[in-house]
Amino acid sequence: MTTINTLVFDLGGVLIDWNPEYLYSKLIPDEKERKWFLTTICTPDWNEQQDEGRSLKEATEHLVGKYPDHERSIRAYYDRWTEMLGGPIHETVEIFRELKFGPAGKGSGGPGAARLKLYALTNWSAETFPVALEMYEFLHWFDGRLVSGEEKTRKPFPEIYRLLIERFGIEPAKGIYVDDNIRNVLPARELGFIGIHFRTPQLFREELVGLGVL
C-alpha cells in the first residue's frame, strides 16, 4: 500500500462554519424572501466570482446597480461578512491538531506530525481571507495554503489543483484531499488524490483511521 504523506484540507464547511444564513436571517426574517434574495441576487455563483479574484467593490456595485431596491442587503454581504462565520468546526480542528502535533497536543509529535504534510486549498476572496487569518490561529498550522482569490482561479477548475501540486511538490498518489463539496472532490480524484467527501467530523475521523493516518 502506498504511504500517504500529504493531506489537503478545504476550509469552509470542513474547518470553518460559514453560512450566509447566519447574517441574512437577521436582515431578512421572512424565510421565503431570504431564500429568494440568496438564490437570485447574492447567489453562490456571484460569490464565487469574488473567490476567483473579482474585487468586492466591483461585485457589490454591479449588483447595487442591477437591484437598487435591495442596496442595503447587498452591501451587507461584505460589509458584515464576518457575521456569516459560525466559528471553527471544533471536532475537525481537533483532528487537524492531532495530525499536526500528535494526540496529546502541541509539541508531542505523533504519527501525523512525523510524516504528513498538511495544506489548505480554499475558494476564498483574497480581500476577506486576511480577516480569517487573524480570527483563527489554526490557519497558521498549515505547511502551505493556496487561496483561490490570490491565484485568480478556483475549484473545481483543474488548474488550481495542478498549481497546488506544482507549488508544494505534492505526489497526488500519496495524498488525500477533503472537501464538503463533492464537485470539488472529483477533480482531485481525477488527478490521483484519495478524495474524501466531508460529511461529519466523525465520519472523516473514521476514514482517516481506515487509511492509517490517525
Model regions: which residues?
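N-terminal helical cap/lid subdomain that shapes the substrate entry/recognition surface
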Residues: 2-94, 125-128
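Generic structural signal for small/hydrophobic residues in well-ordered secondary structure
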Residues: 10-13, 53, 120, 145, ...
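Hydrophobic residues in well-ordered beta-strands that form the structural core
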Residues: 17, 120-122, 197
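Substrate-recognition/cap helix-loop segment adjacent to the acidic, metal-dependent catalytic center
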Residues: 28-31, 92-102, 114-150
